[in-house]
């Protein structure tokens, strides 16, 4: 309850596209969708399919779209493919829907490098998954996201999915990160533990 109230208080005055949100509304509300990254039969990114998806999202009443999350298979795309995908989504949904960009790495140095080098024009926030495979301590998780926040030009959504990463962001670490920076604006909580949301 208190974390949700804190997040709402930090985002209430954040101004984004006025055609979607009125002043004093939270940055992202309603129903969002994590988009797939469509490919054609030859293994190339299907740009026309991205356009059709975006139109479907918009007409269907979706509130915001996550690009290059787990569903978008960002971990299997190379840098060039990611740039192509980013630009296509931005062009297709410009002045229509807010976009969240997934940027993640289990290396803090690499994550910061990716954030600093990625063209985030057209995106409203970055979503970054908890460091995976290495099973960091809670202090390690805090330092990972702290460094990302310090270099990021955009607000950051934490992404907790221990079933895939084998690491779990504790409630205390979430609160600590939220207290550290107003750029931490929320979390995608995919642990499946509903009591954590209630707490």
Each model region followed by its residue ranges:
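Eukaryotic N-terminal low-complexity, Ser/Thr- and Lys/Arg-rich leader segments
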Residues: 8-16
């Amino acid at each position: 309850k208190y974390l949700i109230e804190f997040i709402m208080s930090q985002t209430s005055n954040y101004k984004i596209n006025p055609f979607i949100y009125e002043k004093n509304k939270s940055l992202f509300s309603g129903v969002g969708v994590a988009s797939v990254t469509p490919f054609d039969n030859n293994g190339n990114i299907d740009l026309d399919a991205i356009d059709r998806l975006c139109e479907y999202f918009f007409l269907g009443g979706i509130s915001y779209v996550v690009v290059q999350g787990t569903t978008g298979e960002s971990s299997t795309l190379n840098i060039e493919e990611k740039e192509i995908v980013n630009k296509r989504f931005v062009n297709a949904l410009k002045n229509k829907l807010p976009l969240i960009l997934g940027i993640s790495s289990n290396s803090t140095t690499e994550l910061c490098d990716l954030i600093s080098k990625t063209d985030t024009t057209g995106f409203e926030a970055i979503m970054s998954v908890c460091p995976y495979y290495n099973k960091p301590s809670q202090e390690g998780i805090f330092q990972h996201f702290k460094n990302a926040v310090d270099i990021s030009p955009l607000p950051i959504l934490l992404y907790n999915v221990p079933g895939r990463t084998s690491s779990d962001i504790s409630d205390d670490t979430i609160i600590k990160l939220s207290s550290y920076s107003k750029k931490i604006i929320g979390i995608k909580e995919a642990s499946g533990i509903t009591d954590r949301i209630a707490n």
